[in-house]
Swiss-Prot record:
Its EC number is 3.6.4.13. One of its GO terms (cellular component) is cytoplasm. It comes from the Eukaryota. Residues 237-385 form the Helicase C-terminal domain. ATP binds at A69, Q70, S71, G72, T73, G74, K75, T76. The Q motif is unique to and characteristic of the DEAD box family of RNA helicases and controls ATP binding and hydrolysis. It comes from Ajellomyces capsulatus (strain NAm1 / WU24) (Darling's disease fungus). This is ATP-dependent RNA helicase eIF4A. A motif (Q motif) lies at residues 25-53. Belongs to the DEAD box helicase family. eIF4A subfamily. Keywords: ATP-binding, Cytoplasm, Helicase, Hydrolase, Initiation factor, Nucleotide-binding, Protein biosynthesis, RNA-binding. ATP-dependent RNA helicase which is a subunit of the eIF4F complex involved in cap recognition and is required for mRNA binding to ribosome. In the current model of translation initiation, eIF4A unwinds RNA secondary structures in the 5'-UTR of mRNAs which is necessary to allow efficient binding of the small ribosomal subunit, and subsequent scanning for the initiator codon. Its main location: cytoplasm. SMART domains: DEXDc, HELICc.
Length: 385
């Protein structure tokens, strides 16, 4: 961890330049501990994805690493495998801390760590809001080797001196662009101050806005930079369609027509506000369409139930805000509908990335009103569409 690295100041905002091109194209060649390798294969991996081929080895070797890669490329397993390789299973203390922007993503990462580490004596705790502070404190006092959490709760537990950082080897920031854009900057900077100087920093982000680049210059030492190129991202496998809807009020009928004509395995419909999610859910339900909805105003328990139903397939259409656009991995999502176009291009990447996880094919349909046209042209230019 560094405080004044200047190596990235010349990098243009938006995309980093790779400075590392070594590829390890099989898990067997990574010299992973036997019980970890067994867990990797038991989880269902056969060969590493593009980011796993490039990033796992430098992380295991101890380098600070910046990886620019989108959700759906296998990055969760990248840092999970690396962390599990590095921790001392005999030491009951937090050695790897992983931050994520939402509770759902933190819980998902925890499940991946636990599953891949199934044959190791490893504990992984999800340190998130929505569960009682007392429960959190008890779990942390047991000394889990890996802690996954959201910035607010992790910061609180460190300040209470319940989450001890003395033995910390690795600090991972997943979806760094999202965390920093949602007002977690101060808490994240504070967390850095509590970590030992020797802590390895791994940062993952789909986009590289200025606030992310500032973190890399302040806290990382000569980082290995890995860019998984756009051609290797999940957008490549996603067909994008634009439907011109002259007026906002015509969107509902357009969606109803689509619903009746398109065969959907599972779909996510994105709206820009929580109020719109509730309104659209009510309107579609009144038309006898079966849908479920999720947004940040809901209790954590309710959100967990909805996600469980959606993952299991008992619910096939989910209406959501951007809360869901980051990192929620539902394997069968084949269609994403932007009922409202997102406010920025970063969220567009994350939203439609739901429909092509790990390189699978998917479809994104965007409803475009006259007011949206200028933004659409701009987004298309930036995406090379």
């Amino acid at each position: 961890m560094a405080s004044n690295d200047k190596g990235l100041e010349e990098i243009p905002e938006g995309q980093i330049e790779s400075n590392y091109d070594e590829i390890t194209d099989s898990f067997d060649a990574m010299n992973l501990r036997a019980e970890l390798l067994r867990g990797v294969y038991a989880y269902g991996f056969e060969r590493p994805s593009a980011i796993q081929q490039r990033a796992i080895m430098p992380v295991i070797k101890g380098s600070d690493v910046i990886a620019q890669a989108q959700s759906g490329t296998g990055k969760t397993a990248t840092f999970s495998i690396s962390a599990l390789q590095k921790v001392d299973t005999n030491l009951k203390a937090c050695q790897a801390l992983i931050l994520a922007p939402t509770r759902e993503l933190a819980q998902q990462i925890q499940k991946v760590v636990v599953a891949i580490g199934d044959f190791m004596s490893i504990e992984c705790h999800a340190c998130i809001g929505g569960i009682s502070v007392r429960e959190d404190m008890k779990a942390l006092q047991d000394g889990p080797q890996v802690v996954v959490g959201t910035p607010g709760r992790v910061h609180d537990m460190i300040q209470r001196r319940v989450l001890k950082t003395d033995h910390m080897k690795m600090f991972v920031l997943d979806e760094a662009d999202e965390m920093l854009s949602h007002g977690f900057t101060e808490q994240i900077y504070d967390i850095f101050q509590f970590l030992p100087q020797s802590t390895q920093v791994v940062l993952l982000s789909a986009t590289m806005p200025q606030d992310v680049l500032e973190v890399t210059t302040k806290f990382m030492r000569d980082p290995v930079r890995i860019l998984v190129k756009k051609a290797e991202l999940t957008l490549e496998g996603i067909k994008q369609f634009y439907i011109a809807v002259e007026k906002e009020e015509w969107k509902l009928d357009t969606l109803s027509d689509l619903y009746e004509t398109v065969t959907i395995t599972q779909a996510v419909i994105f709206c820009n506000t929580r109020r719109k999610v509730d309104w659209l859910t009510d309107k579609l339900t009144a038309r006898d369409f079966t849908v479920s909805a999720m947004h940040g105003d809901m209790e954590q328990q309710q959100r967990d139930v909805i996600m469980k139903e959606f993952r299991s397939g008992s619910s096939r259409v989910l209406i959501a805000t951007d809360l869901l656009a980051r990192g929620i991995d539902v394997q069968q999502v084949s269609l994403v509908i932007n009922y409202d176009l997102p406010a920025n291009r970063e969220n567009y990447i994350h939203r439609i990335g739901r429909g092509g996880r790990f390189g699978r094919k998917g479809v994104a349909i965007n409803f475009v009103t006259a007011d949206d046209n200028g933004r659409t042209r701009k987004a298309k230019r930036k995406k090379g569409i």
